[in-house]
Each structure stands twice: as structure tokens, then as C-alpha cells.
From Swiss-Prot:
This is Tetratricopeptide repeat protein 27. The gene is TTC27. PANTHER family: TETRATRICOPEPTIDE REPEAT PROTEIN 27. TPR repeats lie at residues 454-487, 493-526, 528-561, 562-595, 597-629, 630-663. It comes from the Eukaryota.
Length: 844
């Protein structure tokens, strides 16, 4: 049976397997006929099978809900006496679960639409409890609610997922003979999660257990025959981890899949043209894909055969009068991508999605992702990969004026393909679970979003209302300034049926706590959304204590709400509850390790808690996520300086100057200069004096941008020894810096009037004179030495005469006592400088 289970996971039988299957015993059984229907993509026909109909039929229906009834009937069928019969029954129920899941995927993801009547296989007595179809639909949806997270209301044929869940989740303890059951349970979990408003901790726990169980099933992946499934399993695990914020585990799985596939995937540059009128070839970013060690995927018959091009979604041309449809390379043969199989293409798509999740939104990132999509679209072979690549490209192109029209057309084509009956579901299901194709309503939602951005508000609203995506419709109305209309449609829907979500949306529109309280009561105190929305309103009104209470209740119900943890942390900081803030932001970065702002805020909490080393480390993580955020760099600069990471502080200062041309922090520079000059120990115990060269380079850059700050010039002079160095170059540099500092200080008019300010200026001039004397003595050229002495003398003479004019006692006509010492020192230095000048002239 393991061989057939492998084939079922792949979705098809190879020619050899098909021959073997026809000759085997299982093909003649009930489970064999159902398995054949699944291979043929005739999932609806499963529900016409007499045995399966008998499982669902009962002479009497007790007072129970549909889920309980289904579970009871399936377990009754499985609880039989003979071992041989039991194996067959396990197989049949397992295939019922798989077939139901596949049909549910067809009904909501791939198309074409499914026309299944519940009356055909469920007893009428069970269905009569719900008087009308809408009521029955709502009842089934309610059974799929997990962790109080609502299910998308227009989910098509939810009974199919319910059956799949009853078999693959609730009854899995009775299906012990099926080795691949955990993998199908994982697929069921991933599909179920995509219907829910938020991530479900219950589903994630189940997914982790399934992954663990399948990882231990070594026989399934052994040898060349297991190669295809090993790649697929790692990709499916990666997408699961990615969705639940487990980015490191996701990356490991993507890398494992790439290593098994023996692919080398690198972004590189190649000469090419992008526009029709471009004359010269210039460097273009492309994806270079090669197989390592001339590897050829084993057993080509075990990989899906490519779908005919006419059955794939059309790749719309750009039709621009300037930009080419694709890059025209100067040497296309040099970067020829090998003919890739389904698993290899899925690996490239996975690496692309991982790259997207782990890099900040930036123009360069967009170009890199477009290189991935171009590579994938150059080999159109599989519906799921083509759809995923085209969807990603439309998201990347919607911001470009030259590409917006194609993005619009392409999204429309992707939305329309669901109704297309020309491509069989078997073709669409190839490699489906390795690609994370969104459900068809998510594609329509993307189309509506594009329409709204283009200004087609009424068309966007029409789609949102047809999809019953009331939150998007409300946002649309609010942005269009039609607040009354937003309230009107919500009240209209509430008249039809009161739900916690609708009351939450009404609360958002009216900014009314009563609406959230009503939602909370309706949900029987299980709606994380109600408490989240109520908390956000308190936050907006700066009612931080009440806001914290609401957010705490919300994350207690569903701890996988990234945004709520972040807002909770902000509220705690406002209340100066730094321990609570640290805990909240720690949960944020655990859920999303590349959330730069959360890392930054976590460091703020640690600083307030006097845990500076932790703050330093968290800021390092923040910068890995966002290298362009100047406020994070500033926090990093201050924290690095504070903890003695002087080398990092210098690096941070340079980066801040990259981001903000005239950035200045004199206090930090003063600490760094003192650390280097005094040889202070850094955090590792090393003397900071070793950073003298790097700090001189930094101050050189700072003074080239900020030329009018005397204090910075003085720090620069101090770094060169303030004239006390043995090096003539250092003494001269000190003199230059001190002179520039002095010029900055005398640019202000106030220093001449105020005694203390004058004394500071005089002190600076005296220091310049002393350094000038030292510098002149180091000069071999007498003319240069004379110039230095003359400049210092003239400066002192000007200050001395100013003092004698401004700071004179009216009665005695003598200089004020407060400046007597400075004037005497200056006069003595003037005489000394004159004497030295005379000596130099005599030597000349």
C-alpha cells in the first residue's frame, strides 16, 4: 500500500505503476475504485459510491449536529471485526478524507466550480434541522471555527472540509495502517487555516505534530523513488512554518529542498537591454539556475508531466511602446536555465517567497523578486506555479506606471481562470500543495484592491460586496469619505444576521465601545477580534490602562496576533510598565523575527529596565531587518556608546551620516574622543586607543559636513593631541582644528558683550598661540613659520584691544579684574610671538 500512498501524494500513477495497479488486488476493491476516481480527478463521483453513501445514511438521526453525526457514522464503519475487512475500511475512509479535501480545494482554489448537492449523500432528517440552505451553510461554517476565529462566509461547499477534517483529524487514531496520513492531515490543516481570519494556535500545534511524525517516516523518502516526495514535503513544511512566523525553520526547509534538488540558485548580473530604443547593453539583474554536479532528477516518470501551454493562465504581454516585454540578454546562451521538472520549479518559487519574507520592502528587493518571476515564467509548465508567479509579478508591478495596465489585465485573467472548464482539475492540482496558491476569492480581492488604487472605487466596491468582504468595503467607503454609506451597509447586514465581526466593523466606523461589547457578548467572550478592536479604540483615545486590559484578553484567546502584541507593548511603554512592554515586544519578535520596529521598541524597554547589553543585542537584530531606519541607527549609536561598543558606535555614526547628511551628536563624539585619547577599555576589555584612525576618519567626515560647530572642531583637535604630540603633522592638524573652532566661536556677536563668553574665546586664542609656537618650531620653512606666528599674534592683538575697549572700569579707567589675567597672558604671548618672529627674520 505504501507505493500507492506515494502515488496518491504525487497525484498520479506512472505508466509502470498503472500497469502494476491494474494487476493488483486493491484495484478490484471499493477503495480501489475510489482511488482511481481520485487519480482521474473525478472527486465528485466519490459521493456516488454506494459504500460511502451507506456510511452516511442512517435509519434514524439522533439530536446531534452534522459533525458529530459524520464522526459517529465513520467510526461505526471503522469499528468492524475482521482484520482484512478493517484494512479495506481504513483505506476507504482515508480516501474519502483525501477526496473530500481535493474536491474542497477544487471548489475554492483551483476551479472549475463544483456542483455538489448535500441531499445526494446526507440523510434528509439531518439536513431538515436547518430550514434553508443559507442556514445550513452558516451552521457548517460555525463548526469550522477554531480559536474563535471566524471562517470566510462565502466558502464554497464547507461540508467537504468538514468531512476531510472528521476523517483526517478527528478519526486519525483509527487509521493506523495508513503511513502517509499525517501528511494529508497537514494538508488539511493548511487549507483550513487559509479560511480563518487569524492564525490558529490549535492548527499550528497539529501541523507541528504531523511534520514531526512524517519526518520519522524515513521509508517514504528513501532512495531515488522518494526524491520527488522529499522535495515536496520540505516545501510544504516550509510554507507551514512561514505562515506561522517560524522563519528560521521555514528557511531550513527551503534550503533542504534546494539541497535535495541539487540546485544552485543565484542572483547575478548579465548584459542586456530593457527598452526598445536602448543602443548599448548594460548590466541587468537575472536569476542564474544551474544543477550542481551535472545532477539529473531521478525517475522522470515520477514527476508530473507538463500541462499544455493552452491550458495554463495566459501570461499577458506588456504592450509598452518603450519597455520590452522581457530583458533581451546580449548572450542568452550563457545563462540558459536547464529544462526544469515540477519539483525544481517549485523549489525556485519557494526560495523566491522566502526571499520576499526575509527582506524589507525596497526597490532593489522588487527587482530581485522580478528576476525570480521572470525565470519561473520562462518555463510555463504547471498551473499552480504559473498562477503563483503571475500573482507575485502583478503585486510587484502595480506600483509602476508603465506596468500597471498589465498588472490589472493579468489579475483579471487570474480571477477569470477559476470558471474556465477547459483545464482539468487534475492538471491544476499538479504540485498544488507546494505552491501556496491563494483561494480564488483572495485573487478577486487583489483585483478589487488594484481597481481602487486606479480610482475605480465603484468597481472595487462591487467586488468587495459580492465577496461579502465587509471590512474591505468599509475601508473603501471610509477612504472615499462616504462614512454614512459604510454604516448603512453594516446595519443592513446586521439586520440579516448579527455576528461578532459585523459588530466589530460597526464599532470601527462609529468609534463606539458599545458595538465591541455587543460583539464580545455575542461571541460568548471568545472573540479576540472584539477585544482587539476595543483595545485599539482605547489606544487611539490614549486610555492606556483600559487598552492594556483589552489587549491582554485578546492575546490570551489567540496568542498569534502579531499586531496586538505590538500595540500592547506600546501601551505598556506609555504606562511606563517596561517589564510588560519587554514581554510584549519579545512575543512580537518571536512571531516575526524581521520586525525591525518591534526589535527597536524591545531595546527601549530594556534600556528603561537598565538591561543595556540586552538592548544593544536587540538593536543589532533590528538593524538586520531594516538597514535604512535612521531612528534605529540613532538608538544603536547611543546604546553602543553607553555599553562601551566604541567600534560599533563609529560604524553607526557613519551610517547615520549616510542616511542624514548633516547628522550631528556632539555628546557622543565627545565620549568617543575621550575613550580613544584616554585609552579607556571597551566592553571586551580592549583599549579604545586602537580606534584612533577610525575615529579620525569619522571626525574628518563630520567636519566636512558640519563646518560651523566649534565644539566638534575642538574634539577633532584633541584627537590629534591638542598640540602636545611629537608628530609635526599632528601638531599642525591640531592648530588647523583649533583655529577653525575659534572662528566658529567668534561668529556670534554676543561673546564680545558677555565677560564669561569673552574669557572662553580668549582662552581658545591663548591655546592657539601656544600650539602655533610649537608648530612654528617644527617648520623647516621660515616663511611658513612666520605666517603661523603672525596669524596667532594678530588674533591675540585683536582680542586684547577689544578687552581694553569693552571691559574697562568707568571710574579707574583700568581693565576689569575679571579679564585682567587673560589680557596679561595675551599681551605676554604677543610679545613672545613678536620675539620669535624677529628671530626667524634674522635667520632669514
Amino acid at each position: 500500500m505504501l507505493a500507492l500512498e506515494r502515488s496518491l501524494l504525487r497525484g498520479f500513477l506512472s505508466a509502470a505503476e498503472s500497469q502494476e495497479w491494474k494487476q493488483g488486488e486493491i484495484s478490484a476493491t471499493e477503495s480501489g475504485s475510489v482511488l482511481q476516481l481520485i487519480f482521474d480527478g473525478k472527486y465528485e463521483a466519490i459521493f456516488s459510491n454506494s459504500t460511502i453513501r451507506n456510511v452516511f445514511s442512517a435509519s434514524s438521526v439522533a439530536e446531534e449536529d452534522i459533525e458529530s453525526y459524520l464522526e459517529k457514522q465513520i467510526l461505526m464503519y471503522l469499528d468492524c471485526s475482521t482484520e482484512v475487512d478493517n484494512m479495506e475500511r481504513q483505506r476507504l475512509m482515508f480516501l474519502l478524507g483525501v477526496g473530500s479535501l481535493q474536491l474542497f480545494v477544487q471548489s475554492n482554489w483551483t476551479g472549475p466550480p463544483v456542483h455538489l448537492q448535500l441531499q445526494g449523500f446526507l440523510p434528509s432528517a439531518l439536513l431538515q434541522k436547518c430550514l434553508e440552505p443559507k442556514m445550513l451553510h452558516a451552521t457548517i461554517l460555525k463548526m469550522l471555527v477554531l480559536d474563535a476565529e471566524s471562517v470566510y462566509t462565502l466558502t464554497s461547499h464547507p461540508i467537504l472540509l468538514l468531512i476531510a477534517r472528521v476523517v483526517l483529524v478527528n478519526s486519525r487514531h483509527k487509521l493506523s495502517s495508513l503511513q502517509t496520513l499525517p501528511w494529508w492531515t497537514l494538508r488539511c490543516v493548511n487549507i483550513h487555516q487559509q479560511l480563518l481570519e487569524e492564525r490558529s494556535p490549535e492548527l499550528f500545534t497539529l501541523a507541528q505534530m504531523c511534520i514531526r511524525q512524517m519526518t520519522e517516516a524515513e521509508a517514504l523518502f528513501a532512495g531515488d523513488e522518494g526524491w520527488h516526495l522529499a522535495v515536496q514535503f520540505n516545501l510544504e513544511c516550509a510554507y507551514t512554518f512561514l505562515y506561522y512566523y517560524e522563519y528560521k525553520k521555514a528557511k531550513q526547509c527551503f534550503c533542504t529542498a534546494k539541497d535535495i534538488a541539487k540546485l544552485q540558485i543565484n542572483l547575478t548580473g548579465a548584459l542586456g537591454k530593457r527598452t526598445r530604443f536602448q543602443e548599448k547593453y548594460v548590466a541587468q539583474l537575472i536569476l542564474d539556475v544551474q544543477r550542481s554536479e551535472e545532477f539529473i532528477p531521478p525517475h522522470s516518470e515520477l514527476t508530473p508531466a507538463p500541462t499544455p501551454l493552452e491550458n495554463l493562465t495566459m501570461n499577458c504581454d506588456l504592450n509598452d511602446d518603450t519597455v520590452l516585454n522581457e530583458i533581451k540578454l546580449a548572450d542568452a546562451d550563457q545563462y540558459q536555465v536547464p529544462d526544469l521538472c515540477a519539483e525544481e520549479l517549485a523549489v525556485i518559487l519557494g526560495i523566491c517567497i522566502d526571499f520576499q519574507k526575509n527582506n524589507p520592502i525596497h526597490k532593489l528587493t522588487e527587482e530581485e523578486l522580478l528576476a525570480f518571476t521572470s525565470c519561473l515564467l520562462s518555463q510555463p509548465k504547471f498551473w499552480a506555479i504559473q498562477t503563483s508567479a503571475l500573482l507575485l509579478r502583478t503585486k510587484l508591478e502595480k506600483g509602476s506606471t508603465r506596468r500597471m495596465e498589465r498588472a490589472m489585465k493579468q489579475t483579471q485573467a487570474l480571477a477569470d481562470q477559476f470558471e474556465d472548464v477547459n483545464t482539468s482539475v487534475s492538471e491544476r492540482m499538479k504540485i498544488f500543495y507546494c505552491c501556496q496558491v491563494p483561494p480564488h476569492w483572495a485573487i478577486q480581492r487583489q483585483l478589487a484592491s488594484l481597481l481602487f488604487e486606479l480610482g475605480c472605487t465603484s468597481s472595487a466596491l462591487q467586488i468587495y460586496e459580492e465577496l461579502e468582504m465587509w471590512e474591505d468595503a468599509v475601508i473603501c467607503y471610509e477612504r472615499a469619505g462616504q462614512h454614512g454609506k459604510a454604516e448603512e451597509i453594516l446595519r443592513r447586514e446586521l439586520e440579516k444576521k448579527e455576528t461578532p465581526v459585523l459588530y466589530c466593523l460597526l464599532g470601527d466606523v462609529l468609534k463606539d465601545h458599545q458595538c465591541y461589547d455587543k460583539a464580545w457578548e455575542l461571541s460568548r467572550h471568545r472573540s479576540a477580534r472584539a477585544q482587539r478592536s476595543k483595545g485599539l479604540l482605547h489606544l487611539r483615545n490614549r486610555e492606556f490602562r483600559e487598552c492594556v486590559e483589552c489587549f491582554e484578553r485578546s492575546v490570551q484567546i489567540n496568542p498569534m496576533q502579531l499586531g496586538v502584541w505590538f500595540s500592547l507593548g506600546c501601551a505598556y511603554i506609555a504606562l511606563e510598565g517596561y517589564e510588560g512592554a519587554a514581554k510584549a515586544f519579545q512575543r512580537c519578535v518571536t512571531l516575526e523575527p524581521d520586525n525591525a520596529e518591534a526589535w527597536n521598541n524591545l531595546s527601549t524597554a530594556y534600556i528603561r529596565l537598565k538591561q543595556k547589553i540586552k538592548a544593544f543585542r536587540t538593536l543589532q537584530e533590528a538593524l538586520k531587518c531594516n538597514y535604512e531606519h535612521w531612528q534605529i541607527w540613532e538608538n544603536y549609536l547611543l546604546t553602543s556608546t553607553d555599553v562601551g561598543e566604541f567600534s560599533e558606535a563609529i560604524k553607526a555614526y557613519h551610517r547615520l551620516m549616510d542616511l542624514r547628511e548633516k547628522y550631528k551628536d556632539t555628546q557622543v563624539l565627545a565620549i568617543l574622543v575621550r575613550a580613544v585619547v584616554d585609552g579607556m577599555a571597551d566592553r571586551t576589555g580592549e583599549a579604545a586607543s586602537g580606534l584612533k584612525g577610525k575615529l579620525r576618519e569619522l571626525l574628518g567626515r563630520v567636519t566636512s559636513r558640519v563646518t560651523n560647530d566649534g565644539e566638534i572642531w575642538r574634539l577633532y583637535a584633541r584627537l590629534y593631541g591638542n598640540g602636545h604630540s611629537d608628530s609635526s603633522e599632528d601638531i599642525e592638524k591640531s592648530l588647523q582644528c583649533l583655529t577653525k573652532a575659534h572662528k566658529c566661536e567668534i561668529q556670534s556677536n554676543d561673546w564680545e558683550k558677555d565677560v564669561s563668553s569673552f574669557k572662553e574665546v580668549a582662552k581658545g586664542a591663548i591655546e592657539i598661540a601656544h600650539v602655533a609656537i610649537k608648530c612654528s618650531k617644527k617648520k623647516s620653512n621660515n616663511q611658513e613659520a612666520l605666517q603661523i606666528l603672525s596669524s596667532a599674534r594678530l588674533n591675540l592683538r585683536g582680542l586684547s584691544s577689544k578687552a581694553k575697549q569693552r571691559f574697562v572700569d568707568v571710574g579707574s579707567h583700568e581693565i576689569c579684574n575679571e579679564v585682567t589675567d587673560e589680557v596679561t597672558t595675551m599681551d605676554n604671548l604677543i610679545a613672545e610671538l613678536q620675539e620669535l618672529s624677529n628671530q626667524l627674520r634674522d635667520q632669514g
